[in-house]
Amino acid sequence: MLVYTVGTFDLLHVGHLALLKYCNTLGDVAVGVASDDVVNSYKPNVPIILLEHRIEMLRALSCVSIVRPYYELEYVTACQELDPDIFIIGEDWGKDKHNIDVENYLKSQGKEIIKVSYNPKTSSTKIKQTVISQLEESEHYHEPILQT
């Protein structure tokens, strides 16, 4: 049984790990990792962690069997190549054309699509916001070391 999921996986955290461990309870796990250009097509900022490093970290996880980047915002090609039995999507999965296309393809192939909920306490965005907030607070309370 092959389980496929996709994402950015920037600042790999316990929420990502929970998702991947869940996928692994269903079968062997294949992960599609969005390239910076793909992420930038729907988010204002590119990932902090380089694509190659995100791939390397995911490959190091024992619950992940296959890691492959994707360079276009479409999932049908990867699903045709990998032939997953199950496709895992997040609760923020929208109704954009690329999402509907892969849903239609998978349904036509008799494949299962499972939607999972995210942990509201853990997200890459929240981690980034915390870091920014702490930096701003630090700069507010401390004089810069170097002055011009």
What does each model-found stretch correspond to?
Residues 1-148:
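Nucleotidyltransferase catalytic core that binds NTPs
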